[in-house]
From Swiss-Prot:
Residues 78-177 form the Fe2OG dioxygenase domain. Disulfide bonds: none annotated. The gene is ybiX. The keyword Protein biosynthesis does not apply. Its cofactor is Fe(2+); L-ascorbate. Keywords: Dioxygenase, Iron, Metal-binding, Oxidoreductase, Vitamin C. This is PKHD-type hydroxylase YbiX. 2-oxoglutarate binds at R168. Its EC number is 1.14.11.-. The keyword Oxidoreductase applies. It comes from the Bacteria. It comes from Shigella dysenteriae serotype 1 (strain Sd197).
Length: 225
């Protein structure tokens, strides 16, 4: 399942990020890619050794950790260190698959259940640059407003189409979920959304409490902590 998570960053935050990224040190994006990805990757990434990078990635982590919809959809156990990429002048990233595991500075290793892209450029400011994700339901093309995030299974083949005008800047990361199975995670998300909708419409009730109990018992049964 793919999920659109709106408003992870406010317009003011986006403007500040873009200003700071305009002063960043950019390097060849292939430095963080395996052998397969390096053959089809042509973009730039912020140098992870820079002081600016350390500050920006912490801000992204804080933003996603505080976003209730992101938590409900991803049920994150571990978040990778966010990275930042830039596409311009026909740069692109061909179809590839993300690695199943990644090194993590605190946990040693993490499993990549979900991939996330946080858009930092206004969609009208560049041509091309769509995130294209293939899954069992077909092909999905994603180009979201600045400050919005898309979540999708890391098991999906995906690419970024060439940017033929302007500049596309984004942050991206991977998530190890408490719920490994995509279908179970999707069911919990739907249950959670409906519980919240019923609470806002009718207030607290015994039936809602029973559904909440069901949600937490399923989370307890399925989660890997």
């Amino acid at each position: 399942m793919m999920y659109h998570i709106p408003g992870v960053l406010s317009p003011q935050d986006v403007a500040r990020f873009r200003e700071q990224l305009g002063q960043a040190e950019w390097v060849d994006g292939r430095v963080t890619t395996g052998a397969q990805g390096a053959q089809v990757k042509n973009n730039q990434q912020v140098d992870t050794r820079s002081t600016l990078y350390a500050a920006l990635q912490n801000e992204v982590l804080n933003a996603v950790n505080q976003h209730a919809l992101f938590f409900a959809a991803a049920l994150p156990r571990t978040l990778s260190t966010p990275l930042f990429n830039r596409y311009q002048n026909n740069e692109t990233y061909g179809f590839h698959v993300d690695g199943a595991v990644r090194s993590h500075p605190q946990n040693g290793w993490m499993r990549t259940d979900l991939s996330a892209t946080l858009f930092l450029s206004d969609p009208e400011s560049y041509d091309g640059g769509e995130l294209v994700v293939n899954d069992t339901f077909g092909q999905h093309r994603v180009k979201l407003p600045a400050g919005d995030l898309v979540l999708y299974p890391s098991s999906s083949l995906h690419c970024v189409t060439p940017v033929t005008r302007g500049v596309r800047v984004a942050s991206f990361m991977w998530i190890q979920s408490m719920i490994r199975d995509d279908k179970k995670r999707a069911m919990l998300f739907e249950l959670d959304k409906n519980i919240q909708s019923l609470k806002s419409r009718y207030g607290e009730s015994e039936e809602i409490l029973s559904l909440l109990n069901l949600y937490h018992n399923l989370l307890r049964e399925w989660s890997e902590i």
